[in-house]
């Protein structure tokens, strides 16, 4: 009754609210697509249920290099501490077995007591002094008040063994630290790719293009680019292949993937019959579950180490009907690169159909170019007309201002009745 008499506002009536909610379509948030290669080049792959963990210990050096820095530093510190403690126990046992500790406890601790010539290691009277002597032996920082004598052949054996173990630990751990700092992927941090790839017409063909550049002046020798398309496919027998990799060629006059990366380059792939993008149109691209992986390989000029940079483009990162802007200009005899426009694109005329349809009906490209030319001419006409209108408005406003600033002529009457104009 309250609703009928409009005492309750209509926006609070439950029946109306329920009807409006039913009319509104429920749009669920689309889950982000899992990509095989991240934009940074890291492999987005998780290894689970590995049973034979011992295989990693068979190649211990590679395992140490592949660890994270915090784990490597912990192992680096613990290896030295454990070796020092182990040999400190051995030195203390040598002194304990020879009776050096009891001798110092009975006769006192004096340098002139004559005990130094009768003990294995001088001034090793506790575990703390044995630990300090172990550090002095392995790190070779120089002997102070503690030194070894000729009294115990066992002490000489322990000394030789600790020196060998210390050299092995130094070689392995320092080599591991060096390899981690000089890894090839560090050089790949200055190899950059455009955030988006584009599909546009080049030389009458639909082409898939992206831009790659090098921020350093030192070059990448024998640089090559490989492109792969990864997508989920189903065989005629019904087998589902979750990661189907297919190489696609790079447009190069010498029919090779090698490039000369002295300046940012636009890598082009012609979408032809061999391309997996041959049957994909602009509308189909949005719903495609594919990933284009780009791999750049080469040799670092300064170190001679082979490096590799990777990135990928999913369907949402491919812009149809765009082209990269030019960023290389010549200034005073030197080529200049503006990296602020590295990933900038502009919209260009491109057919929305697939490359197959374009090959079957070449007139589609001609019609698209004609339409773009007409639209370009119309935009130029509108722009020129706007400029003319603006210029006319400016001229009219200037005339009005000038007319308002004009001084009116004043006439004076002479006694004889003649008019005499005043000079302004």
From Swiss-Prot:
GO terms for biological process: action potential; adaptive immune response; apoptotic process; atrioventricular node cell differentiation; blood vessel development; calcium ion transmembrane transport; CAMKK-AMPK signaling cascade; cardiac pacemaker cell differentiation. It catalyses: K(+)(in) = K(+)(out). It is a multi-pass membrane protein. The record marks 170 as: Role in the control of polyamine-mediated channel gating and in the blocking by intracellular magnesium. Residues 374-424 are annotated as: Disordered. Residues 1-69, 177-424 are cytoplasmic. Residues 127-138, 139-145 dip into the membrane without crossing it. A motif (Selectivity filter) lies at residues 140-145. GO terms for cellular component: glutamatergic synapse; inward rectifying potassium channel; myofibril; plasma membrane; presynapse; presynaptic active zone membrane; protein-containing complex; sarcolemma. It is found in: Membrane. Keywords: Ion channel, Ion transport, Membrane, Phosphoprotein, Potassium, Potassium transport, Transmembrane, Transmembrane helix, Transport, Voltage-gated channel. The chain crosses the membrane at residues 70-94, 155-176. It holds the Pfam family IRK_C. Interacts with ABCC9. Inward rectifier potassium channels are characterized by a greater tendency to allow potassium to flow into the cell rather than out of it. Their voltage dependence is regulated by the concentration of extracellular potassium; as external potassium is raised, the voltage range of the channel opening shifts to more positive voltages. The inward rectification is mainly due to the blockage of outward current by internal magnesium. This channel is activated by internal ATP and can be blocked by external barium. Can form a sulfonyllurea-sensitive but ATP-insensitive potassium channel with ABCC9. This is ATP-sensitive inward rectifier potassium channel 8. It comes from Rattus norvegicus (Rat).
